[in-house]
Amino acid sequence: MLGTLQVFYSLWITAIVAEGFHGEELIEHFKTDALEELGHAEKLANRILELGGSPVVDPGDWAAGTGNAWVAPRKDFRDADRMVADQIKSEAAAIRHYNNMTKMTFGKDPVTYNLVTGLLADEVEHEEFLENLVGSKGRARGTKASRAKKTR
């Protein structure tokens, strides 16, 4: 949940401050993805509560619980290519995280497993959109496409 909240903020603020994007499609994509990430965080928080846990309530504690270093949005709001590259890296990290969660929950917690596989599918879709966008603009991809691994 914590990494999802960080990604939400990164996407949201990028959509707000970015300049010089290659069209409104990218800004709209970031806004839509930000709202999806917020929805993911809500689903995960609800599942944590269902399992008897407590979600982290202090945003200052988000980075400590993610296992991923916080990557702040770029200060150069005109560097759309690097902003996209940063978001591709964020999606790849989310895919790795959700792959690990599917491995941990497969055969043990079917409710969480089903939740996480749905979130994983969303992240793969987001990553592929961004990689296709970068590829269609004739720029170097910078990252290899991550693929969701089957856990069975």
At which residue positions do the language-model features occur?
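Iron-associated oxidoreductase/ferritin-like identity signal
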Residues: 1-152
